[in-house]
Amino acid sequence: MKITRTARFKKAWQELTQEEKALGRKALRNLATDVRYPALRAKKMQGTEHIWEARVSRSLRMTFEIAGNTIILRNIGRHDETLEQP
């Protein structure tokens, strides 16, 4: 699948530590291979129709949408902060 990033995702990415970015890159590789990759625990967010959340690490989450053959990355960061503003 093709992956694109929103401006908000790009900004949030810059705020991550190097260690968090490494975990994020691994999660993105898994996401591009298979949205249902078990470690991601990807699921649709409650109260939204098209937004998904996935686990990057124990404390990090990312949100995304799927449009055809494209994954649109929306946000990444701390669990609560990211899921409050998907």
Residue locations for each model-derived region?
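Short hydrophobic/aromatic-rich motifs at helix boundaries and adjacent loops
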Residues: M1, W13-E15, A32-D34
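Short, structured coil/loop segments at alpha-helix boundaries
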Residues: T17-K21, M45-T48
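Enriched for short, Lys/Arg-rich terminal
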Residues: K2-K11, Q18-A22, R55-P86
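A short, surface-exposed loop/turn module that caps and links secondary-structure elements
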Residues: R29-A54, L83
